[in-house]
Amino acid sequence: MGTKHYLCTNYFCEIMKKIFKAFNYLSFILVLIFFSTCKNKENPELKKYTLNGRTQGTYYHIVYYAPTDKWCIKNNWQTSSQIKKGIDSILIKIDNSISLWNPQSLLNKINDNQTNVMNTILKENFLAAEKISKLTDGNFDISLGALIEAHGFAAKERKKLSKQEIDSMMLYVGYKKLRLEDDKLIKQYPQTKIDFNAIAQGYTTDQISNYLKRNNINQHIVDVGGEVFASGKKPDGQQWRVAIEEPSKDMYAEREYNSFIKLENKSIVTSGNYRKYIEEDGIRLSHTINPKTGYSVSHNLLSVSVIAQDATTADGLATAFMVMGKEKAEEFLNTHPEYDAIFIYSTKEGEIETSHTKNLDQILEKAE
């Protein structure tokens, strides 16, 4: 049997061509709508959110970019009010754990020897502090609590200390006199008191930043008392710009800026002695205590800003560098190129000078 062939008329062919053309056009439109919807879901329009408040005796300032609350509700993301509640919860937990200003904090109970059981927040701070102490040859030390308290930089009233008093308290100072066994803190001396203030705000900054990232908020900057972490870039592609304060003559002087730095996925923490000090017999005493002597540091380094991958480390190193002084801190940086720093110091002639590590040449600009 032969094969049958069906030939269409010209009119019928024209009709079919129009149908196929319309079908292809409709399919193209549907594909565009589909991908447009997917794109809008994956890359929604971002809105700027700002949060300000008080914690640990200082301020916090947070800026982040996220979808609108309407979009978040539709896509089962955390809304801005839920994000705020989450951050508040973090701040409360940290305050209840390591704050010296909170009489009921777990740290105060440990310092008073009411307990030696540490929670997760205390353990994380202890281990971070221990790491920085080892890294800096003991120039960072959390066991200075009793001395800092006696010098008048903590929550209690100050009294003038004699050399004998300082020497006696130094017996209980030394990070090696503390150790962690499971969840318990073991003190060599019960008189030893812990002070996490030199990393607490950096730790808080990191915890807030990590919380935002867990909630798909990757474009943000967190500042807790000057301890800053900048995540990602702004929606316009610009890096975050952070100001570095010019050291002032006294703690009440109006703030002026020395320079600005551009940051992306890094932290910057500044430590200085020009706003936190006490005066005794006409002499200005720094709030930074040398853990090897028990006395306030005395050198020409006015402030140091440390750039690191996380705020906890940057916070601890900034304190350690203020103890070391400029020259020893620079020696440390020569062997640890993963960290950068900006030094503001006074010369013998009384002039204020600035220096920085070479890696910052392209992202650091002098203030006008």
What are these regions (language model features)?
Residues 11-25, 35-368:
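Mature catalytic core of soluble alpha/beta enzymes
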